[in-house]
A protein has these predicted regions:
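Conserved SAM/SAH-binding beta-strand->alpha-helix loop
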Residues: 96-98
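N-terminal auxiliary segments of SAM/dcSAM-dependent transferases
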Residues: 1-28
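Conserved SAM-binding motif I beta-strand of class I
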Residues: 89-94
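Conserved class I S-adenosyl-L-methionine
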Residues: 66-75
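Conserved SAM-binding loop of SAM-dependent methyltransferases across substrates and taxa
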Residues: 76-87
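A short acidic, Gly/Pro-enriched loop at the edge of an enzyme's catalytic core
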Residues: 124-132
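Conserved SAM-binding strand-loop segment of SAM-dependent methyltransferases
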Residues: 109-120
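A short glycine-rich, Lys/Arg-flanked "PGG" loop and its adjoining helix->strand segment in the class I
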Residues: 149-166
Length: 172
């Protein structure tokens, strides 16, 4: 079973899609997809967060079962499940607890998943990762990073988290 780690959670969610996230959580807990709903009930956030098409962003990449992946900005888990199917272990970081709860509900059966809730800048990891995946959050990350040159600081931090020769991917 996946692990939901709240050690770095400050009880403050910094962003949200609003009340639709409660609907998304309920859908995830019930194992439902937006495809199960009548068309008039489907909204953009449902499709955005739950469409299997989003996995295509990295499904082609030849991850191996020996690989460890750090997923930064995991959101509601749009690509988390795919990463878990391909890699040996996935550590997903999400700033919003509600989104992490949705990700957990979607992927709770994954034995190789740890979801960490909180600001990446506050976290420490006992190991480095073979791959660091930044999926559509780089443009927001600067809002949660202090410093004069936050983009450079963020890129440097990602590099420190990956093994020597590790790969960093920023996909939108």
């Amino acid at each position: 079973m996946a692990e939901l780690n709240l050690d770095y959670y400050t009880a403050k969610d910094h962003y949200s899609d609003g009340d639709i996230e409660e609907t998304l959580l309920k859908m995830a807990q019930e194992g439902k997809s937006f495809e199960d709903l009548p068309e008039e009930e489907v909204s953009f956030p449902m499709v955005y967060h739950f469409s299997g098409l989003r996995e295509n962003i990295l499904s082609w990449y030849p991850l191996k079962k020996a690989d460890s992946v750090l997923e930064i900005g995991a959101g509601c888990g749009a690509i988390t499940g795919m990463l878990c199917r391909k890699a040996g272990h996935v550590t997903s970081v999400e700033l919003s607890k509600r989104r992490a709860d949705i990700n957990y509900a979607r992927n709770r059966d994954k034995e190789n998943l740890t979801i960490m809730v909180g600001n990446l800048n506050d976290m420490t990891f006992p190991e480095k990762f073979d791959y660091v995946v930044v999926n559509g959050v780089l443009e927001y990350a600067m809002s949660f990073t202090e410093g004069k040159n936050s983009l450079r600081d963020i890129s440097s931090a990602y590099g420190r988290l990956s093994e020597a020769g590790g790969k960093t991917s920023d996909r939108h």
